[in-house]
Amino acid sequence: KWVFAIDKITYGGGALVGSDGTIYQCVRDASIKNVYAINPNGTQKWSLQLDGPIGAFPALSADGVLYCLTNKSTLYALDVANGAIKWQQSLDGTTGSAVAIDRNGHIYAGTSEAIYAFSANKEELWKLSGVNVTEQGTFALNGNTLYATLKSKAGLVAVDITNGTKKWTYPTTGGDAYFPIVDKKGVVYFTEKGSQTVYAVDADGSKVWVKKVNNNLNYSGAALSTDGVLYIGT
């Protein structure tokens, strides 16, 4: 129907669509504008250049705030009406990796060194240090648990979002893990690019199954159908 062009050929970051149909696209380049709000008809609503490339998927709150995390490990809260910066916060770490919002409006941000929880007004609620969240990753939220995929065989970590304590970790064998999703029974699925493996882990951290595939799983996510079929892009 339409094509929206940015200022140069580069890597795209995460994108999402608001309730009014506005598309928010982040870009992994700091030399150009790297956050775009695009109207449903393909015209630009606004654009903005933040302090670093954006590999992490953004998150959108119910009250119209877009949260973006750059590879300078700076978390931004942007007004979706015009792209104005409501607030920003520098985090520990050399890479910004993932952002999510829960039903209470709390924001979770993961970097190469920690996972943080903030209120909508920038108050830090807790910080879990010593976790290296995979760049270009996402979080999965289920009840009071946040699931994050980690780099360098660290696998999957489950975090209690009420206090920031680590519930458990599920280590892997091959490399960086990506894109956790949770089914209605609480089973968590994620991929790992080093060993080309798909994992299913129960809510208590125990193995459900592990499947090695013969295709490249670099940056590969998954989708789960209502009838229990897991689809994986390679």
Name these PLM-found stretches.
Residues 1-234:
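Extracytoplasmic/lumenal domain signature
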